[in-house]
Amino acid sequence: MKYIFNRYNALLLRRPLITNMITTGLLVGGGDALAQFFFPNNDNNNLEQQPFDYLRNLRAIIYGSLIFAPIGDKWYKFLNTKVVWTRNAQKPQYQRSMSTLLRVMVDQLVFAPFIGIPLYYSSMTILENRQPFLDNIIDKFNTSWWITLKSNWLVWPLFQFFNFYLLPVQFRLLAVNIISIGWNTYLSYVMHSQK
């Protein structure tokens, strides 16, 4: 296990974006696969067992690797360098705690509601070719945005506090991706439960 971690760390240092793109794609795809396995009959209340949808899973992998990972990579670097508590700089522990709290607030009050959740639903709507795109995106927001955001606030703030406080910036997206296996299962379930 230590070898795998050391190898992954070396890849993160040498090629951070590519490493994050591959990791995120695989873990978002894993979340979709779990959603299909655990909630196979959620599509339009169909009671028949549905076969595994490989194209749906491929779309999830594409979203994770090509859309979310580059944005997430930049987002965590932005939070780490630009969202910093500057008052009481003579007390480093206080400054670190307040910077962490501020990062969680920005992440949960800006990124989640206005970037992360809309990006997922609009990207998946387009990747699934649900035309007319704009009408279907608006419908998905109307039916799922608020419930997803409330669920997000149950899962992410506490985790993100520890993520931002304890982990170096290069490992934050990986930590989010690991927790996101469950979160992506939920997102995939919500995305495909109300077409």
Swiss-Prot record:
It is a multi-pass membrane protein. The lineage of its organism: Eukaryota, Fungi, Dikarya, Ascomycota, Saccharomycotina. Belongs to the peroxisomal membrane protein PXMP2/4 family. Pfam families: Mpv17_PMP22. The keyword Transmembrane applies. Keywords: Membrane, Mitochondrion, Mitochondrion inner membrane, Transmembrane, Transmembrane helix. The chain crosses the membrane at residues 17-39, 59-78, 99-121, 168-190. The gene is SYM1. This is Protein SYM1. It is found in: Mitochondrion inner membrane. It comes from the Eukaryota. GO terms for cellular component: cytoplasm; mitochondrial inner membrane; mitochondrion. May be involved in cellular response to stress. Required to maintain mitochondrial DNA (mtDNA) integrity and stability. Its main location: mitochondrion. It comes from Candida albicans (strain SC5314 / ATCC MYA-2876).
